[in-house]
A protein has these predicted regions:
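Short, Lys/Arg-enriched N-terminal segments with co-localized hydrophobic residues
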Residues: 1-3
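Sec-dependent N-terminal signal peptides of Gram-positive bacterial secreted proteins and lipoproteins
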Residues: 7-36
């Protein structure tokens, strides 16, 4: 075969590299974007739920909880409202220095679906003087656990610490949080 000079080999190499990179980028554009959401054990049989905001939820806690309910209701396929049914309760009170700013708990029917739930904000850590937006992210986080979401990445409501998500710029449900809830219902 014909011998190529060193100069000819050097000129050919960048063309190979560019075509390989372009092929790689094209193939990567075909890969669907992965979702970061995960699931908790909670899964309601009915996608329409009512949360009862207990008397302890007042002032900025009430405003932020109502905003969280509205955000979930408008951004997802579920129907979420406030009312006086005792199936899902939300409370904000001083649970003391226990390490959590918010917590959700639920019990299950024999079928495995969620029977009832409670979402709690610990005012020991989440002070009434904090911004409503910060409280809203915490309510969104706890309500989303009850809708069936587990923890996710820091740029979502479902990051393991709602305050860290807030400090990272999260204010409302993100597209990942929305996809997670919608895929569940």
């Amino acid at each position: 075969g014909a011998k190529m000079s060193k100069l000819q080999r050097c000129r050919k190499w960048p063309i190979s590299l560019v075509s390989t990179l372009l092929s790689f980028l094209f193939l990567m554009s075909m890969v669907p974007v992965a979702s970061a959401y995960s699931y908790s054990k909670s899964h309601w049989l009915n996608k329409n739920q009512v949360v009862m905001l207990m008397a302890t939820v007042k002032g900025n806690y009430l405003t932020s909880a109502q905003q969280a309910v509205s955000n979930i209701n408008s951004a997802t396929k579920v129907g979420f409202s406030t009312g006086t049914r005792m199936v899902w309760q939300a409370t904000s009170q001083n649970f003391g220095k226990n390490g959590w700013e918010g917590q959700s708990a639920y019990t299950f029917l024999a079928s495995g679906y969620t029977k009832d739930a409670v979402s709690r904000v610990n005012t020991y850590y989440m002070k009434s003087s904090y911004p409503v937006a910060r409280m809203r992210v915490l309510w969104l986080h706890e309500f989303s656990h009850c809708w069936g979401l587990g923890h996710s990445t820091i740029n979502t409501v479902m990051y393991k610490s709602a305050s860290d998500a807030y400090n990272n710029g999260v204010r409302y449900l993100t597209s990942d949080d929305i996809k997670g809830i919608n895929s569940r219902y």
